[in-house]
Amino acid sequence: VSKVRTATEVDVFVGAQLKVLRKSTGLSQNELANQVGVTFQQIQKYERGTNRIGASRLWSLCQVFNVKPGRFFEGVEKHMAKADTKSSAD
């Protein structure tokens, strides 16, 4: 039995942070992919939040951008509060 993995709001948020970091350093998706050993399609999926970033991959990304892992989660509490408010209003 295979489990379908769905992206969470946190995955989407972390992916958006990845995109911000990548663009701020001027790297293309392809260049970043080469540096961390994945395809550019995988970077696209990370940035959209459709694929989760595992701990070891997150560590590799931190090395590329010279940031601590917490950088990817800065502001997530506020983002989640907005998402919760939005979903309870539906």
What are these regions (language model features)?
Residues V36-I53:
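Recognition helix of helix-turn-helix/homeodomain-like DNA-binding domains
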